Amino acid sequence: MDIQRFLKFYKVGWKTYRDPLMEASHSSIYYWREQMKAMALFTTTEERLLPYRSKWHTLVYIQMVIFFASMSFGLTESMGDHVQMGRDLAFILGAFFIIFKTYYFCWYGDELDQVISDLDALHPWAQKGPNPVEYQTGKRWYFVMAFFLATSWSFFLCILLLLLITSPMWVHQQNLPFHAAFPFQWHEKSLHPISHAIIYLFQSYFAVYCLTWLLCIEGLSICIYAEITFGIEVLCLELRQIHRHNYGLQELRMETNRLVKLHQKIVEILDRTNDVFHGTLIMQMGVNFSLVSLSVLEAVEARKDPKVVAQFAVLMLLALGHLSMWSYCGDQLSQKSLQISEAAYEAYDPTKGSKDVYRDLCVIIRRGQDPLIMRASPFPSFNLINYSAILNQCYGILTFLLKTLD
């Protein structure tokens, strides 16, 4: 692992935060990708051609199969203990989510890389030259937001990993960070102390590696949609200030034509992004809903035990927090995209321009009336309205369980 390459995002982010006049040379998604490359788990054709990279990817996939199979086998030991089964199922769902994402981006790595390259090439979206629109404030805000997102996530991830790895030291019924079972009872400390130590180290290392990779891919995914949202904001700025240069008819026609193409490029990249993340968006919606339902079920069943209720309440909040983050990001994308038609309407000036200019503005107005959405068909789009519907559904499940058990 290339530590310097991995930490570059934090160094650049801190310098950008400290110096208001400093501009990062790349967008945040470029640095997220660099972190995944530093971990040797950015699965593109180009990366697999590097020395030993393909072998490392294969080794990681084998470790994932072993990790998931041992946890699934450990579930059989929890039969009869509903609380322990709930914990095991929660970790199994989380492990399955990570494994699915890893294998998924093994197939879609090249498409993801192309989306990142296209977005980074268009960044900061504004037309270069004299007197550009004031995009620096938005660019800085999105980059610093990504930096603080990465920093806060990393901080809480370190706490979570510390609790997981040290849990056998303060939880008497647990002898491994994750409940698992191996053939010949290799996981039993009293029978096989050496193999138990190896399994302990394997689970600790693999949890650190996989959860760090998950943080990077989640940050990358969120920031890709945030970058598209920033592109929409710049497009709106340029539309509202299209007459700032006092263009002649020919120059104004060229400018409106460029903005039509920029709008089309944003729509095209969003469509490709939704295609790339189609499987993962469906999976995370399913996993989050499953974790929330499982947490509600276990908390209701063990409602007389405050410790158990607190554990599953935290799990439920984590799942809802993850879903709310994606819903908010999708909602912002949709809301900002609806401002495009308003900005194009403001750009209309009957005293300036020609029929071709008005036609270009009409094209943007017509396209801008349809909101751009983060969606994985056939499921509904990610926004706060659908998020509220999910919360209502969870509340309905909780009410039903309480009435049934009472």
From Swiss-Prot:
The keyword Membrane applies. One of its GO terms (molecular function) is olfactory receptor activity. Keywords: Cell membrane, Membrane, Olfaction, Receptor, Sensory transduction, Transducer, Transmembrane, Transmembrane helix. Disulfide bonds: none annotated. The keyword Nucleus does not apply. Residues 77-88, 166-218, 297-307, 403-406 are extracellular. The atypical heteromeric and topological design of the odorant receptors appears to be an insect-specific solution for odor recognition, making the OR/Orco complex an attractive target for the development of highly selective insect repellents to disrupt olfactory-mediated host-seeking behaviors of insect disease vectors. Odor-evoked OR currents are independent of known G-protein-coupled second messenger pathways. Belongs to the insect chemoreceptor superfamily. Heteromeric odorant receptor channel (TC 1.A.69) family. Or49a subfamily. This is Putative odorant receptor 65b. The gene is Or65b.
